[in-house]
């Protein structure tokens, strides 16, 4: 039992030891991806990666993972909103169509227009 507790603690230390930027909203997620992708692209384009390059990649992936998780959560919610619109259209529920439709359109418009970072 103690071994599993120690293993769990070690796993947490391994995966939560680098500072990262949170993505509280879709715009922040997009901007973090844009910025950190540039750094990742410049490193991965090198013929040979140094140990420092690999450490930098390790560090920046935490921020990229946070951004991707935010986008996944927002897209999942957009899918739920769209399904609500679909089902409400079958039941002729105007208020649900308008409310859920607005949420869906707001979320997807951010995807289509791209934020100004």
Tell me the role of every PLM-derived stretch.
Residues 89-117:
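C-terminal amphipathic alpha-helix
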Residues 4-8:
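N-terminal signal peptide c-region/cleavage motif recognized by signal peptidases
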Residues 9-55:
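Immediate post-signal-peptide N-terminus of mature secreted/exported proteins
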Residues 30, 34-45, 76-90, 101, ...:
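Regular secondary-structure segments
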Residues 46, 63, 70, 110-117:
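A structural signal for alpha-helix termini and helix-coil/disorder junctions
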Residues 56-96:
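Long, amphipathic, charge-rich alpha-helical segments that form helical bundles/coiled-coils
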